[in-house]
Amino acid sequence: MRFGLLAALIATPLAAAPVAQGPANVPSFKPAFPNQTRAEAVKTRTPLKITEVATGLDTPWGLAFLPDGRMLVSEKQASALRIVSPNGAKSARLTGTPPTDTRGQGGMFDVALSPDYATSGTIFWSYAESRTGGTGLAVARGRLVTGAAPRVENVRVIFRMMPTLDSIQHYGARLVFARDGTLFVTMGERSILPGRVQAQNLKSDLGKIARINPDGSVPKNNPFVGKAGVRPEIWSYGHRNVEAAALDAGGRLWEVEMGPRGGDELNRPEAGKDYGWPTIGYGEEYSGLRVGKGLTQAKGMEQPVYYWDPVIAPSGLAIYSGKAIPEWKGNFFIGGLASTALVRLVLRDDRVVGEERLLTERGDRIRDVVEGPDGALYLLTDDSSGKILRVGPAKP
């Protein structure tokens, strides 16, 4: 009898341990399919080197590489853009950008280069805008002028998230250019209850991902174009606060969004689909009460590809395509604010099969993750004297 039990135990493969993390806030919530949460822990085999490229940035939020290898960086609290050289030298703050509202979670957010930047010099940025009755997310474009007096010229606001709301939280604000030249804009639901419920309201931009043309007009093939009572810029809806988004090798959009207490999500937003917030989710209110009816599934609402409980507080996403670290090919790298980690996900057939937490020993809140032209990852740390970190192989 004992021999039979021992043989059975030997024959049964043990479940691999997940990444070390705290207990779930809502242990009664169960995943909808295997590996939807707490996937097997994996470990990068390539020895890594972490280099501080630049320091002294005022709460940096977004980063984009210029063709010459310099970096365009936003400073959230300073409401400014800077150009940072590979040696860490910082330009003066660019002039010409509109004023921002820096209260709460507001300020200067993401930056992106136009697909035709090499000829047009056009850049895009998102920011919190003061308005009558509250605030909202805005997206502007202009021509970048470098040199001794760096500035932005011909500035034009091309998009404003509507409606205006008396809130200083959950702006979203990531900018991602699609392969066809259209621009994805992520928009938070503003956190407070009057905004949260609008994530399911197609007359509102709150809690949505928008898809617009570079001039701010709406693409004719957006999913809700021509439908009465619906904002035509909407691509997908039912989102909470998306501060991480990127395209994969096939040009598909992925996003990682913040949950409440538990329930951060990885999603692949498709045209016209509903991602559930606040009707379904895998977290609870900060008070410990359930969100709505406490549902994790509902008809017509998409399941997250992956979720975290406890949260990582995701901000910034890069999907690795470089050659510097071959074992990372196709892996997802997510900035973790609350988790103070660079979170690595290994996917197979659009399902997560492994997770790793990198840089945890540093204790940095990571705000953005960008793959550089050299195949290294460049990170922004979220503090009043923020850094640009380079994560690359120890041996070039």
Protein language model features and the residues they cover:
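Gram-negative bacterial Sec-dependent N-terminal signal peptides
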Residues: 3-15
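Internal metal/ion-chelating core segments
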Residues: 175, 182-195, 199-236
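Beta-propeller blade signature
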Residues: 137-147, 201-215, 269-270
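Conserved blade-ending motifs and adjacent loop-strand segments that build the rim/top face
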Residues: 239, 352-373
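Repeat-solenoid scaffold signature
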Residues: 230-270
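Surface-exposed loop and turn segments in beta-propeller and other repeat-based domains
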Residues: 92-106, 154-171, 214-235, 278-309, ...
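Acidic, Gly/Ser/Thr-rich repeat motifs that build Ca2+-stabilized beta-propeller blades
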Residues: 17-193, 244-247, 252-255, 259, ...
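Short acidic/glycine-rich loop or secondary-structure boundary segments that cap or lie
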Residues: 254, 261-267, 274-278, 284-290, ...
